[in-house]
Each structure stands twice: as structure tokens, then as C-alpha cells.
């Protein structure tokens, strides 16, 4: 067993399938943690996850999150202090509505398995196009 520690990296590690910047934090056998950031005025792509579920905690910015699973669909306001769940198979999309980036920490259970986990779905809003 080891004890891990890591600071939030200054540079992104990857771009998520939804288009947000990802900074990978820590990983254990049962889950992983990452920081997601979406620039002001941007709208993510809409995706769903095949096998993982997530818990998000919003740290900065303000925006909206669309979630749809089977016959339930909602749009919620997200801002610092808001925590929400994204069960496996849930379609979701988010957008940054403020003047600062929308930033959240997400716990993924089980750990993110890699390419192919997220798949594109039809979203609530048009995705913002930009060079990455």
C-alpha cells in the first residue's frame, strides 16, 4: 500500500471526449479523480459512459448541466459548492455561462478505463467548436 499526493497540474493532461480540459489527479483500484475545466462561454459535447459513474463537485464558474437517463431528463444550474451524480449510461452535457472557466473535480468509479468508455450522443445544446 502506498500513500499518494499530487498537486493540480498547471497544464492539461488530455482533452476529454466532451471537449473539456482534463488534469488527471489520483487513481486507486476502486476509483479515480480528475479536474475538468471548460472555458467561459463554451458548451461541451454530449456524451454517455458505458461502465463508469461519476460524482462531480463544482469548484469555479457557473453554468448548466443537462442529464438524461431513460425517461428522466433535467437541466440544473451548477456553481461552486454544487455536487451531482452521473450514473453509468446517463447522457450529459454542460456549458459555462460565466466570465470565468467552469471547473469541477470528478470522482470516477471504477477508474477511467480508457478510450471507448465515453460515446457521443445527441445533446441539449450545440457544442462549441474550437481548436484544441
Label each PLM-derived region with a short phrase.
Residues 1-35, 45-46, 116-132:
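A short, N-terminal "cap"/entry segment at the start of jelly-roll beta-barrel domains
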Residues 21-32, 41-57, 71-72, 80:
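A short beta-loop-beta micro-motif enriched in histidine and acidic residues
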Residues 35, 65-67, 104:
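Short hydrophobic/aromatic-rich beta-strand segments that constitute the beta-sheet cores
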Residues 55, 99-117:
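A short hydrophobic beta-strand segment most commonly corresponding to one strand
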Amino acid at each position: 500500500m502506498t500513500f499518494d499526493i499530487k498537486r493540480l497540474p498547471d497544464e492539461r493532461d488530455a482533452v476529454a471526449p466532451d471537449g473539456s480540459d482534463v488534469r488527471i489527479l489520483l487513481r486507486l483500484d476502486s476509483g479515480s479523480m480528475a479536474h475538468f475545466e471548460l472555458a467561459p462561454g463554451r458548451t461541451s459535447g454530449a456524451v454517455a459512459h458505458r461502465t463508469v459513474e461519476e460524482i462531480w463537485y463544482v469548484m469555479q464558474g457557473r453554468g448548466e448541466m443537462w442529464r438524461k437517463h431513460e425517461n428522466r431528463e433535467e437541466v440544473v444550474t451548477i456553481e461552486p459548492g454544487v455536487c451531482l451524480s452521473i450514473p453509468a449510461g446517463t447522457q450529459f452535457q454542460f456549458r459555462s455561462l460565466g466570465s470565468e472557466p467552469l471547473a469541477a473535480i470528478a470522482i470516477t468509479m471504477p477508474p477511467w478505463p480508457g478510450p471507448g468508455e465515453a460515446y457521443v450522443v445527441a445533446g441539449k445544446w450545440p457544442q462549441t467548436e474550437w481548436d484544441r
